[in-house]
Amino acid sequence: SKANYVTNGQLFQTIIQRERNFEYEGEDVEVALHVPEEIINRLEQAAIKLKADFVICEIGGTVGEYQNILFIEANRIMKYRDGRPTAHVHVGYLPTPPSIGEMKSKPVQNSVKQLVSSGIQPDFLIARAQGKIDERRKQTLAWTTNIPAENIVSAPNVASVYSVPSSFDKDGFTDQLLKHFDMPSKKKDLRKWNNLVSKINRVQKSDKTVNIAVVGKYFDSGDFKLSDVYVSVIEALKHG
């Protein structure tokens, strides 16, 4: 719905219109003040409208980019104002250069430092990598980022995106997230979900094929093919 999608253009248009309507009562309109407040307002309104217990806000891009700095500032304000129950989950990539064959944690360490310089200490770290992160690197990340080791979650490549929830749960993400919000950890029954994942995996391994054309503008970028640009459409076709 409209409440689930926010762009910079929408925010600026709303603020400019309010200023033109004298809703700020002559107060100077400042980007660093009023835009983050409007972001927070939209998140709160989405929760009210949808009667949500939790609101998940994805901030795209990379820490340090000018395009998302106002959203990060809004997150900082929410995290430290009025004791709001907010969790910041940072996703970082640990590359394994083929020439070295070793998983490197330095890029994630630097991205967390960049985030901390913006006023946010992450509560959780999703360690995205080709394979499962080992205990040694998890401890290194905990030491260098001030994120508890139990809050560092491994996110290796999986055959299907639907395998991700089970992978996170096995690494303790569910229990730690509930603990962060002072909520009791309930006994989980993931059998139905795991059965769905098994069915999807069987379909993907099937030798039967159906040709479906997806016409899109952004499949190519120079010499590279962008496999995830229309991922929502493609995943819907896979299990539709």
Predicted regions and their residues:
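Flexible phosphate-sensing "switch/lid" loops adjacent to ATP/NTP-binding sites
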Residues: S1-G240
